[in-house]
From Swiss-Prot:
Any one annotated GO CC term: cytosol
Species of the source: Colwellia psychrerythraea (strain 34H / ATCC BAA-681)
Alphabetical list of HAMAP family matching this protein: PdxJ (MF_00279)
Catalytic reaction(s) noted: 3-amino-2-oxopropyl phosphate + 1-deoxy-D-xylulose 5-phosphate = pyridoxine 5'-phosphate + phosphate + 2 H2O + H(+)
EC number: 2.6.99.2
Enzyme type, top EC level: transferase
The keyword Transferase appears for this protein: yes
Gene: pdxJ
Protein name in UniProt: Pyridoxine 5'-phosphate synthase
Cellular compartment(s): Cytoplasm
Length: 246
């Protein structure tokens, strides 16, 4: 059985903090709890508008994490400079629109290949492993290879949004084909967006996936059950998906 890693996104702890402009709840403390419960890494998205995660969070997490930071960022000069200063283990390049509630789709690597290749080169030179958040589209996957990014994160949001089981199965097959295609080209494949306790197992069973990044569902469950239990429950579902599909 291949190991499947869990990256816990703590952005929504910061969202709750920013709603009142207080210094609590602290995403840094939440990251520590998540690590204790079995998280293999912590994901944070420093958005240009600073709507949740703040610069301070990134710097303190860098000093305190026992696992590794996955720093989600737009492809801008400001974010590249911050990443090169902080030097997280991973940077995931994502599309970003100020008016969106959350990331709405994958990065258009095909249409921005030169820009993304340059950013990848800069981040790689700083010792950071680069991932591109993309849809399971062959053209985008081919462009990711051309950019020299070693990792991709496949966008699972459309799969997660579908309510029909039949439609979900069709989308799951599309994702699986794309993930296997990327893996065969030598890319290391992660996945995430919209995954929760009810839809994670079919994705977790795809053996080419190295890591799932999950945030909103875990933080929402934590509001009821507590963060430690929420992380442990998600890890158990992922383990079951791999155990029963070997």
């Amino acid at each position: 059985m291949s190991e499947l890693l869990l990256g816990v996104n703590v952005d929504h702890i910061a969202t709750l903090r920013q709603a009142r402009g207080t210094n609590y709840p602290d995403p840094v403390y939440a990251a520590s709890v998540a690590e204790h419960a079995g998280a293999d890494g912590i994901t944070v998205h420093l958005r240009e508008d600073r709507r949740h995660i703040q610069d301070r969070d990134i710097h303190v997490l860098k000093q305190t994490l026992h696992t590794r930071m996955n720093f989600e960022m737009a492809v801008t000069d400001e974010m590249i400079a911050i990443a090169c200063d902080v030097k997280p283990v991973f940077c995931c390049l994502v599309p970003e629109k100020r008016e969106e509630l959350t990331t709405e789709g994958g990065l258009d690597v095909v249409g921005q290949l030169d820009k993304i290749t340059k950013a990848t080169e800069q981040l790689t030179a700083a010792g950071i492993a680069v991932s591109l958040f993309i849809d399971a589209d062959k053209a985008q996957i081919d462009a990711a290879v051309a950019s020299k990014a070693p990792y991709i994160e496949i966008h699972t949001g459309h799969y997660a949004d579908l309510s029909s089981e039949e439609e979900q199965l069709i989308e799951l097959e599309r994702l699986t084909v794309g993930i296997k295609y990327a893996h065969n080209l030598g890319l290391k494949v992660n996945a995430g967006h919209g995954l929760n306790y009810f839809n994670v197992k079919p994705i977790a069973a795809i053996k080419e996936i190295i890591e799932l990044n999950i945030g909103h569902a875990i933080i929402a469950r934590a509001a009821i059950d507590g963060l430690d239990k929420a992380v442990r429950d998600m890890k158990q579902l992922m383990l079951e998906a791999r155990t029963y599909n070997t």
